[in-house]
Design a protein with these regions (language model features):
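His/Asp/Glu-rich, glycine-adjacent segments
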Residues: 1-78, 87-94, 214-220
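Substrate-binding rim/cap in mid-to-C-terminal beta-strand-loop elements of soluble/periplasmic
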Residues: 149, 157-200, 270-312, 328-330
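Secreted, luminal/periplasmic, and some membrane-associated catalytic domains
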Residues: 1-23, 101, 112, 116-261
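Solvent-exposed, acidic/flexible segments
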Residues: 53-61, 103, 107-111, 197-205, ...
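Extracellular low-complexity, Gly/Ser/Thr-rich intrinsically disordered linkers
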Residues: 47-73, 77-83, 88-90, 256-258, ...
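C-terminal beta-strand edge segments of enzyme domains
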Residues: 314-330
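Short, solvent-exposed turn/loop segments enriched in Gly/Ser/Thr/Pro and often Arg
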Residues: 85-87, 136-139, 320-324
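A long, amphipathic alpha-helix that forms part
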Residues: 50-76, 89-130, 205-207, 211, ...
């Protein structure tokens, strides 16, 4: 019922204690972490702590092994697909930051969980009868306060502050609103009435764009109108925004934060920007169809699905990714 280090403390990089980590209520920034929380913590919080520990990923690995055996996955005359999302590491990163002992420990434990799963597949399915694609949906920013302590520009931009600045600017020019319905991280959503005016006159939102652009931590502010058509833009920021844009779900105005600035005050750190550290993730393949090696050609998590599909001669013509042919056995 306690999460402690898998290895000795000397095998971890950096100090365990950090003034910048925002541990969840019931925990501190120091190992060990009782899954029951501190004394007086409601028993129901056990599941919250368990989910935000490496033990949830270990459980998922055991459950996957059970599914393979129970449903004879990979052991029949058919192609089976098993998708797993090891999300415990994400929670740990949000709570303690990417340089913490907790993240290092979660990675070490996840490595063991994967080793056990692959060993089971080798013995149950056969080493030459399965292929694995492993990646991540995002990277992570360092803790802004830790970066700022090194003399580097960093900080937090809060949704409420963006909304206040945007609404004040729009009211000053266009009269009493409301004009802004919601600010959600990098997305600013206009009210229905304001959106109707913006569709008729793209310059309508300019007061908001100008005001938010002057805020600390803001790199760019621009309209999302027609953004879905700019996926091939030479501008890396615009292209990244376009790749993540959905015309029916995304905001009317996109706010891009400067490097090392994040848009939340409720967790130690987060992700979700166009910055390289948020896009830098591994793309790893395992199995007989693949050549061992490290490849320096550009790749993306979007390439995993078409590459795996190619193994069963299935094409994905509308996929964003490509088949990573350089990694395949000829």
């Amino acid at each position: 019922d306690v999460w402690d280090r898998l290895r000795t403390s000397g095998e971890y990089i950096g100090p365990d204690e950090s003034p910048f980590e925002r541990a969840r209520t019931g925990w501190t920034s120091l190992f060990p972490h009782p899954l029951a929380g501190a004394e007086g913590t409601p028993p129901a919080r056990f599941f919250d702590f368990w989910e935000r520990s490496p033990f949830s990923d270990a459980y998922l690995g055991r459950m996957a092994a059970h599914l393979v055996r129970a449903y004879q996955l990979g052991q029949r005359d058919a192609v089976d697909y098993l998708g797993l999302s090891f999300s415990g590491l994400d929670y740990v990163g949000h709570d303690f930051g990417p340089e913490s002992h907790e993240v290092q420990d979660a990675l070490a434990r996840l490595d063991g969980t994967l080793a056990e799963l692959f060993a089971m597949l080798d013995s149950t399915v056969g080493r030459d009868r399965y292929a694995v694609g492993l990646s991540a949906d995002h990277g992570v920013a360092r803790i802004p306060e830790a970066v700022r302590a090194e003399g580097i520009d960093a900080g937090r931009v809060l949704n409420a502050e963006v909304l206040k600045a945007a609404e004040a600017a729009m009211t000053a020019v266009h009269g009493v609103g409301p004009h802004v319905a919601l600010v959600e991280y990098t997305n600013v959503y206009l009210t229905k009435a304001a959106r109707a005016r913006a569709e008729k006159d793209p310059r309508f939102i300019q007061p908001m764009v100008d005001a938010v652009s002057k805020m600390s931590g803001i790199q760019r502010v621009f309209s999302s109108r027609g953004l879905e058509t700019r996926r091939d833009s030479a501008d890396p920021i615009e292209r990244a925004a376009a790749m993540g844009h959905h015309p029916e779900e995304s905001g009317d105005v996109i706010v891009v934060l400067k490097p090392n600035w994040i848009g939340t005050n409720t967790s130690t750190t987060t992700h979700g920007s166009w910055q390289p550290y948020d896009q830098h993730v591994p793309v790893v393949f395992l199995g007989a169809p693949f050549k061992a090696g490290r490849y320096t050609t550009p790749a993306s998590p979007a390439d995993v699905a078409p590459t795996l599909a190619s193994l069963i001669k299935m094409s994905m013509p509308e996929a964003d990714g490509r088949v990573l042919t350089e990694s395949l056995q000829r």
